[in-house]
């Protein structure tokens, strides 16, 4: 990977440098009050201990956005107080074949594009940030999208709720990198969440991760490569340097490119 992030020693084993400083721009260095650069796909972070970090609301909602939150969201929002339906595909009408999850969908660009491109797949979008939820609701209404359900809580709780082996794919795209060492425990990718994803994914299901922050890419690789249930689907450098086919670039991804930061695109298969 770029910048000496991933290296091979003389015996061919992968070596990681996760102690290097990251270049996440405009991050606030105050404990407990971190506001990331504008446009990130995941301005809020949750992890397996049930803790919540970040912000749930930004700019004041416009009148129509507030109306969507009040009237449309209740029809699409998942309530996880009771057991999940089995099969999980029963969440969707009309019937679908597979269910995928996107964690921290931000403005919803990638999730909307995937839902439109795959009408036979059901999508669950997890995003506690109210403004992001309002944006995606506007697109769902405008395009009459029927294969998206939404969850406004802790994604780790959602992973624990879905039946084992019920997800075909999990996407985590440009998550908050929490670049300061003392904040690394706030990153979504932790041993506990990797275990939770392993349980939720079907055999041969995929976890896909995108970030322009080298340190978080190395962190994610280190966690997934030591997980016994995941295989890294990369055979050559272009497999992580270039987006997979038909990938929809997000607003934050375009911003990162303009500022000279190249993203890495990591794919892991559930064994």
Predicted feature residues:
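S-adenosyl-L-methionine
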Residues: 6-101, 109-118, 137-165
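Conserved SAM/SAH-binding beta-strand->alpha-helix loop
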Residues: 129
């Amino acid at each position: 990977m770029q910048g000496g992030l991933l290296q091979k020693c003389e015996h061919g084993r992968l070596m990681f440098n996760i102690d290097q400083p990251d270049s996440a721009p405009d991050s606030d260095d105050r404990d407990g009050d971190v506001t990331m650069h504008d446009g990130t796909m995941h301005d809020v972070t949750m992890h397996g201990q049930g803790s919540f970090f970040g912000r749930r609301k930004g700019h004041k909602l416009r009148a129509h956005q507030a109306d969507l939150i009040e009237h449309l969201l209740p029809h699409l929002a998942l309530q996880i107080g009771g057991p999940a339906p089995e099969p999980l595909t029963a969440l969707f009408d009309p019937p679908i074949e597979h269910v995928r999850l996107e964690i921290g969908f931000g403005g919803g660009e990638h999730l909307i594009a995937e839902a439109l491109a795959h009408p036979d797949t059901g999508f669950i979008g997890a995003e506690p940030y109210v403004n992001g939820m309002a944006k995606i609701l506007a697109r769902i209404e405008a395009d009459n999208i029927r294969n998206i359900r939404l969850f406004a809580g802790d994604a780790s709780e959602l992973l624990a709720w879905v039946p084992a082996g019920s997800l075909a794919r999990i996407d985590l795209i440009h998550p908050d990198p929490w670049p300061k060492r003392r904040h690394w425990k706030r990153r979504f990718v932790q041993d506990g969440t990797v275990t939770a994803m392993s349980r939720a994914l079907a055999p041969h299901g995929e976890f896909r991760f995108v970030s322009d922050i080298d340190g978080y890419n190395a962190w994610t690789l280190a966690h997934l490569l030591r997980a016994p249930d995941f295989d890294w689907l990369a055979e050559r450098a272009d497999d992580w340097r270039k987006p997979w086919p038909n990938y929809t670039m997000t607003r934050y991804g375009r911003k990162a490119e303009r500022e000279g930061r190249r993203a890495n695109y990591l794919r892991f298969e559930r064994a």
